[in-house]
Protein backbone atom coordinates (compact mmCIF):
# COMPACT_ATOMS: atom_id res chain seq x y z
CA UNK A 1 0.00 0.00 0.00
CA UNK A 2 1.35 3.44 -0.87
CA UNK A 3 2.55 5.58 2.01
CA UNK A 4 0.92 8.86 2.91
CA UNK A 5 2.27 12.11 1.50
CA UNK A 6 4.65 13.75 3.97
CA UNK A 7 4.67 17.52 3.47
CA UNK A 8 6.27 18.31 0.13
CA UNK A 9 7.70 14.82 -0.33
CA UNK A 10 6.01 12.70 -2.99
CA UNK A 11 4.15 9.56 -2.06
CA UNK A 12 6.32 6.51 -2.59
CA UNK A 13 4.93 3.77 -4.75
CA UNK A 14 5.28 0.24 -3.39
CA UNK A 15 7.59 -2.29 -5.01
CA UNK A 16 6.31 -5.79 -5.79
CA UNK A 17 8.18 -8.98 -6.62
CA UNK A 18 6.16 -11.42 -8.71
CA UNK A 19 7.60 -14.85 -9.36
CA UNK A 20 5.15 -16.95 -11.35
CA UNK A 21 7.15 -19.98 -12.42
CA UNK A 22 6.02 -21.56 -15.70
CA UNK A 23 3.27 -20.39 -18.03
CA UNK A 24 0.92 -23.06 -16.69
CA UNK A 25 0.39 -20.65 -13.79
CA UNK A 26 -2.22 -18.72 -15.79
CA UNK A 27 -4.45 -21.78 -16.03
CA UNK A 28 -3.99 -22.97 -12.45
CA UNK A 29 -6.65 -20.65 -11.04
CA UNK A 30 -7.13 -22.84 -7.94
CA UNK A 31 -3.53 -22.30 -6.79
CA UNK A 32 -3.31 -19.91 -3.80
CA UNK A 33 -0.62 -17.88 -5.59
CA UNK A 34 -3.06 -17.16 -8.42
CA UNK A 35 -5.55 -15.60 -6.00
CA UNK A 36 -2.74 -13.63 -4.36
CA UNK A 37 -1.56 -12.29 -7.71
CA UNK A 38 -5.12 -11.30 -8.62
CA UNK A 39 -5.32 -9.49 -5.26
CA UNK A 40 -2.05 -7.65 -5.93
CA UNK A 41 -3.29 -6.69 -9.40
CA UNK A 42 -6.50 -5.35 -7.85
CA UNK A 43 -4.53 -3.37 -5.25
CA UNK A 44 -2.27 -1.85 -7.87
CA UNK A 45 -5.04 -0.90 -10.28
CA UNK A 46 -7.58 0.36 -7.72
CA UNK A 47 -5.57 1.69 -4.76
CA UNK A 48 -2.07 2.56 -5.96
CA UNK A 49 -3.29 3.64 -9.43
CA UNK A 50 0.11 4.28 -11.02
CA UNK A 51 0.33 5.94 -14.42
CA UNK A 52 2.60 3.10 -15.53
CA UNK A 53 4.50 0.10 -14.15
CA UNK A 54 8.26 -0.43 -14.47
CA UNK A 55 9.07 -4.13 -14.86
CA UNK A 56 12.48 -5.74 -14.41
CA UNK A 57 12.62 -9.09 -16.18
CA UNK A 58 15.04 -11.89 -15.39
CA UNK A 59 14.34 -13.49 -18.78
CA UNK A 60 16.70 -11.22 -20.69
CA UNK A 61 20.28 -10.31 -19.94
CA UNK A 62 22.38 -7.57 -21.43
CA UNK A 63 26.05 -6.81 -20.98
CA UNK A 64 27.39 -6.44 -17.44
CA UNK A 65 27.91 -2.70 -17.94
CA UNK A 66 24.58 -1.67 -19.47
CA UNK A 67 20.88 -1.89 -18.82
CA UNK A 68 18.55 -2.44 -21.76
CA UNK A 69 15.33 -0.45 -21.68
CA UNK A 70 12.38 -1.52 -23.80
CA UNK A 71 11.06 1.59 -25.55
CA UNK A 72 8.43 -0.26 -27.58
CA UNK A 73 4.82 0.77 -27.28
CA UNK A 74 3.15 -2.40 -28.57
CA UNK A 75 4.91 -5.72 -28.07
CA UNK A 76 4.22 -9.20 -29.30
CA UNK A 77 4.41 -11.81 -26.58
CA UNK A 78 7.25 -14.29 -26.59
CA UNK A 79 6.55 -17.94 -25.94
CA UNK A 80 9.89 -18.48 -24.18
CA UNK A 81 9.11 -21.96 -22.89
CA UNK A 82 9.10 -25.46 -24.34
CA UNK A 83 7.21 -28.72 -24.03
CA UNK A 84 3.80 -27.38 -23.04
CA UNK A 85 0.49 -28.32 -24.71
CA UNK A 86 -0.17 -26.46 -27.98
CA UNK A 87 -2.82 -24.14 -26.54
CA UNK A 88 -0.19 -22.46 -24.30
CA UNK A 89 1.36 -21.03 -27.47
CA UNK A 90 -1.93 -19.41 -28.47
CA UNK A 91 -2.38 -17.11 -25.46
CA UNK A 92 -2.60 -13.42 -26.30
CA UNK A 93 -1.90 -10.48 -24.04
CA UNK A 94 -2.85 -7.05 -25.38
CA UNK A 95 -0.38 -4.59 -23.92
CA UNK A 96 0.80 -1.04 -24.13
CA UNK A 97 4.26 0.24 -23.43
CA UNK A 98 5.12 3.80 -22.49
CA UNK A 99 7.96 5.44 -24.39
CA UNK A 100 7.49 8.48 -22.14
CA UNK A 101 8.10 6.43 -18.98
CA UNK A 102 11.00 4.62 -20.65
CA UNK A 103 12.67 7.94 -21.50
CA UNK A 104 12.21 9.21 -17.92
CA UNK A 105 13.88 6.05 -16.59
CA UNK A 106 16.68 6.41 -19.14
CA UNK A 107 17.18 10.04 -18.07
CA UNK A 108 17.45 9.05 -14.38
CA UNK A 109 19.87 6.23 -15.14
CA UNK A 110 21.97 8.55 -17.31
CA UNK A 111 22.15 11.09 -14.49
CA UNK A 112 23.58 8.28 -12.34
CA UNK A 113 26.10 7.49 -15.13
CA UNK A 114 24.53 4.13 -15.88
CA UNK A 115 24.78 3.17 -19.54
CA UNK A 116 21.55 2.29 -21.30
CA UNK A 117 20.64 0.70 -24.62
CA UNK A 118 17.19 1.36 -26.07
CA UNK A 119 15.64 -1.85 -27.41
CA UNK A 120 12.29 -3.10 -28.66
CA UNK A 121 11.51 -6.62 -27.55
CA UNK A 122 8.47 -8.74 -26.95
CA UNK A 123 7.08 -9.65 -23.55
CA UNK A 124 8.40 -12.84 -22.00
CA UNK A 125 6.07 -15.17 -20.10
CA UNK A 126 7.40 -13.89 -16.77
CA UNK A 127 5.60 -10.64 -17.57
CA UNK A 128 2.57 -11.48 -19.70
CA UNK A 129 1.47 -14.55 -17.74
CA UNK A 130 1.66 -12.68 -14.44
CA UNK A 131 -0.09 -9.61 -15.80
CA UNK A 132 -2.85 -11.79 -17.30
CA UNK A 133 -3.49 -13.46 -13.95
CA UNK A 134 -3.42 -10.12 -12.14
CA UNK A 135 -5.72 -8.52 -14.72
CA UNK A 136 -3.50 -5.46 -15.08
CA UNK A 137 -4.28 -2.97 -17.78
CA UNK A 138 -1.56 -0.38 -17.26
CA UNK A 139 1.18 1.03 -19.45
CA UNK A 140 4.50 -0.56 -18.58
CA UNK A 141 8.19 -0.11 -19.24
CA UNK A 142 10.46 -3.13 -19.19
CA UNK A 143 14.18 -3.26 -18.51
CA UNK A 144 16.74 -6.02 -18.74
CA UNK A 145 20.09 -6.45 -17.09
What does each model-found stretch correspond to?
Residues 101-145:
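Internal, conserved structured core segments that host functional sites
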Amino acid sequence: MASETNGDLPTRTPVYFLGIGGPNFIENTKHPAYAQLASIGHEITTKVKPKAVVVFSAHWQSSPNKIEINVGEQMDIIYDFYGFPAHFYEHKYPNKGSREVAEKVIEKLGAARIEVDRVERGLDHGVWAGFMAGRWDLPWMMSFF
